Amino acid sequence: MNMLPMFTYSGLPVTLLCLIQLRRSVMILWIVVIWVQKPFHHLTTYLSRLHMTIILTVLPNLCPLTVGLSEEGPPCLRTFRDPFLGHMQLISKDQLSIPWMIGLPKQIVKVKWKVLCDLGWT
């Protein structure tokens, strides 16, 4: 597993663990971990009080997009392991009712900064 370092941008209220790349045979799994450090006023009152860890997991074999939510903040990142081992509980996109999740594609082949722009976090 090739884990890139975590980058903190003072201009952005997110800490982004850019890419975790797992190579098993021909499968490449892209994971983006976004930790919201500050509340956002344009979110609902409930969501603005949370420190959320959002995990976008994309499989090239067109598996549905899964998103893991946690209120733990940094400790959640320290307990992160290989997602194939199931240490992180994931919930499907269809189980979410968060407004900004509506309209996200079920598959994202390549993750870029455009994801942050589409979520309104830049």
UniProtKB/Swiss-Prot annotation:
It comes from Saccharomyces cerevisiae (strain ATCC 204508 / S288c) (Baker's yeast). The lineage of its organism: Eukaryota, Fungi, Dikarya, Ascomycota, Saccharomycotina. It comes from the Eukaryota. Partially overlaps SYG1. This is Putative uncharacterized protein YIL047C-A.
